[in-house]
Curated annotation (Swiss-Prot):
Source organism per UniProt: Arthrobacter sp
Example of a GO biological process term: galactose metabolic process
Name used for this protein in its record: Beta-galactosidase
Record text on subunit structure and interactions: Homotrimer.
Residues binding substrate: R144, N182, W349, E389, K390, F391, H392
Catalytic-site annotation from UniProt: E183 (proton donor), E341 (nucleophile)
SUPFAM superfamilies: (Trans)glycosidases, Class I glutamine amidotransferase-like
Recorded effect of pH on activity: Optimum pH is 6.5 with ONPG as substrate. Over 90% of activity in the pH range 6.5-8.5. Highly efficient at pH range 4.5-9.5.
Region: Disordered, residue numbers: 1-31
Protein function: Hydrolyzes p-nitrophenyl-beta-D-galactopyranoside (PNPG), o-nitrophenyl-beta-D-galactopyranoside (ONPG) and chromogen 5-bromo-4-chloro-3-indolyl-beta-D-galactopyranoside (X-gal), with highest activity against PNPG. Also acts on p-nitrophenyl-beta-D-glucopyranoside (PNPGlu) and o-nitrophenyl-beta-D-glucopyranoside (ONPGlu), but with significantly lower activity.
Reactions that this protein is recorded to catalyse: Hydrolysis of terminal non-reducing beta-D-galactose residues in beta-D-galactosides
Group of enzyme by EC: hydrolase
Gene Ontology CC terms, in alphabetical order: beta-galactosidase complex
Length: 694
């Protein structure tokens, strides 16, 4: 337990932080620009795993790649056991051939460090690298991601194979990007082993400096949890009752940090050997992944890359896709990003793995491009015949060429070639939704007023409403610049720093319409309640004081004064400078404000004290859009997804994606890039138009 890590174990930042940008900036960071300098047009391809196939199939792959228009592939992600079959013994013959052959057909490569699954010989020699769960269970090999990022031994071996790969391929003309590890935090995102505990203690000591500062931050006077030294602290594992919330929150921060510090340790090797080659890892930004603070990770990635998979059972899965893509663009600070993985059709890991409908793959792919992706990639190139993912769809299905999926892959490749002029353009938004992983973590730690308050629910309800109206929206960190946004939505931002709260208040004072919801501003970054009445950090901005929470029982609803209903949450709101626009009805909150507004500077601050039903959300969004002056990207029939990308030279591209089974009208003028003809104003059922606007 008392183990100390050697100097240098905490790897330094290897390049400067990413520059924060205002919404309208069209300037790429140097690292991002260098990625696209290596790839012509929109990147198109997927994970390529040639080690699973004989040479004859690999040669056929080259023909099929050219037929489909592939120009970008990730290679070697899970190949460590073949590249280094025994410690210090390497076999690069197959990879040499693959790199040379791909270069021969003009394909650029995101070469992986191959570290996402340690080989069997390494696990046998060093079982201490295996991850340990909260109940003390050691997770064994036979799958993937079976290591802990805090293992000094694993870091040494991972850095070793990374260095050998970098030295061998540093001058290869196919190398465009380093794909560092893979889906960090997937399957296992919390680590409880002895080495993890030691790393956690060291992280805490560096964060707080003294044990007294930690005791104050964690409120350890409660339940006799006081610590006399950092050596007494363990990760928050299985315990008789609820655990210290400050300890839980810091453990979330630590695990997110540990995964990224492991990434940085490999990038340090790559920077040393190949300083001109950009580096990234594939995130999993979506409504399903909360364990990693991707906004804090972004500064260490030269280009943001993301994996996204639909939930087949979700009837509005295209809206969740838009949410994920908008979040990814926000993490990227507005830069173009890479869709590193999605599926051509069914996945293999959901309870019922339905295929995508005809045309859905094209709509999905172009929806990501519409929202900022400059590369569209899949898992994987060729569908495996063995292994856990053999029923996961791929670009080349088990049935080969004579399949719907392959024909749609070829059609998509042709469409992306036509969209080359879109590359480098950016999505412009005048509306923003504030998004913070730490607030997500803190709000869902146990012992809150209601288990029904989930961080994403209200946030996604507002995003959905804006999506349906064709209003473009950015996801922004609470500390990021809000200049240029006319509408800012702050949903269940339970914990917030003083600086972030001031940033949001400044947006209202500067002319923005700001909406803050219930259960926002309640605690500071230590999860200490801000005393004096809720909503704490936003009380003065909003001109309200909440005396007491009134969470609703499961299934209960409240009628509001405008005739709509709400659920989940209510509270006793007092006006303190604000004006009531809506009230609760019925005992015990009859006449108590449920929606308020306060004029602030040249803007306004609204407060929402409940979770409205869909009619209530729609009515409120209409009111906010009217006040802020934010308008839809264009006018179109219902069911058409609208997004605009604008290039630095002023050119604009309107993406109109028809998610319905009937032709739809879109009011726009220009040339449809996909057809090469003047846009007629109609998008056929299930089709996409990309209009280079006049």
């Amino acid at each position: 337990m008392g183990k100390r890590f050697p100097s240098g174990w905490f790897s330094p930042r290897v390049h400067p932080p990413r520059r924060q940008r205002s919404p309208m900036t069209n300037q790429a960071t140097p690292g991002t620009a260098s990625v696209w300098n290596n790839i012509e047009g929109i990147g198109f391809g997927g994970d390529y795993n040639p080690e699973q196939w004989p040479v004859s199939v690999r040669l056929e792959d080259l023909e099929l790649m050219q037929e489909a228009g592939v120009n970008f592939l990730s290679v070697g992600i899970f190949s460590w056991a073949l590249l280094e079959p025994a410690e210090g013994q390497y076999d690069f013959g197959w990879l040499d051939d693959v790199m040379d052959n791909l270069h021969g057909i003009g394909v650029k490569v995101a070469l992986a460090t191959a570290t996402a699954a340690p080989p069997a010989w390494l696990v046998r020699k060093h079982p201490e690298i295996l991850p340990v769960t909260a109940d003390g269970t050691t997770l064994g090999p036979g799958s993937r991601r079976h290591y802990t990022p805090s293992s000094a031994v694993y870091r040494k071996y991972a850095a070793g194979i990374t260095r050998v790969l970098a030295e061998r391929y540093k001058d290869h003309p196919a190398l465009a990007l380093w794909h560092v590890d893979n889906e960090l935090g997937c399957h296992v995102s919390e680590f409880y082993g002895e080495e993890d505990a030691a790393a956690f203690r060291l992280w805490l000591e560096r964060r707080y400096g003294t044990i007294d500062a930690l005791n104050a931050a964690w409120g350890t006077a409660f339940w006799s949890q006081h610590y006399g030294s950092f050596e007494e602290i363990l990760p928050p594992g299985v315990a008789p009752s609820t655990l210290n919330p400050g300890q839980q929150l810091d453990f979330q921060r630590f695990n997110s940090w540990a995964l990224m510090d492991y990434y940085r340790s490999l990038v340090a090797v790559l920077r040393e050997v190949t300083p001109a080659v950009p580096c990234t890892t594939n995130l999993m930004a979506s409504s399903a992944t909360k364990s990693m603070d991707y906004f804090s990770w972004a500064k260490d990635l030269d280009v943001i890359a993301n994996d996204h998979y639909l939930v087949a059972a979700d009837p509005e899965r295209h809206i969740e896709l838009a949410f994920s893509a908008d979040l990814t663009r926000g993490i990227a600070g507005g830069d173009p990003w890479i869709l590193m993985e999605h599926s051509t059709s069914a996945v293999n890991w959901q309870p019922r793995n339905q295929p995508k409908m005809p045309g859905e793959m094209l709509r999905n792919s172009l929806a990501h491009v519409a929202r900022g992706a400059d590369a569209v990639m899949f898992f994987q190139w060729r569908q495996s015949f063995a292994g856990s993912e053999k029923f996961h769809s791929a670009m080349v299905p088990h049935g080969g060429r004579d399949t719907r999926v392959w024909r749609e892959v070829v059609d998509l490749g042709a469409a992306l070639q036509l969209l080359a002029p879109v590359r480098g353009s950016r999505v412009e938004s005048r509306a923003a939704i504030v998004f913070d992983y730490e607030a997500w973590w803190a709000s869902e730690i146990d012992s809150k007023p209601s288990i029904d308050v989930r961080y994403l629910d209200l946030l996604r309800a507002f995003h959905r409403s804006l999506f349906l109206r064709g209003v473009s929206v950015d996801m922004v960190h609470p500390s990021a610049s809000l200049d240029g946004y006319d509408l800012v939505l702050v949903c269940t931002l339970y914990s917030v720093t003083d600086e972030a709260a001031a940033n949001i208040a400044a947006a209202a004072a500067g002319g923005a319409t700001v909406l803050v919801s219930y259960f926002s501003g309640i605690t500071d970054e230590k999860d200490h309640v801000r005393l004096g009445g809720y909503p704490g950090a936003f009380r003065e901005l909003l001109g309200v004081r909440v005396e007491e929470f009134h969470p609703l029982l499961a299934g209960s609803q409240l009628k509001l004064s405008d005739g709509t209903v709400s659920s989940i949450w209510s509270e006793h709101v007092h006006l303190d400078g604000a004006e009531a626009f809506q009230t609760f009805t019925g005992y015990p909150l009859e006449g108590v404000p449920s929606l308020t507004r306060r004029a602030v500077g040249t803007g306004a601050a609204w407060y929402l004290a409940t979770f409205p039903d869909r009619d209530g959300i729609e009515s409120l969004v209409d009111r906010l859009l009217a006040e802020s002056g934010v308008s839809p990207v264009a006018e179109a029939d219902a069911g058409v997804e609208l997004t605009r990308r604008r290039s630095a030279d002023g050119g604009s591209f309107l993406f109109a994606i028809n998610h319905t089974r009937a032709a739809a009208s879109v009011r726009a003028s220009g040339t449809d890039v996909l057809s090469g003809e003047r846009f007629t104003g109609t998008v056929e059922a299930g089709s996409v138009a990309v209009i280079a606007e006049d």
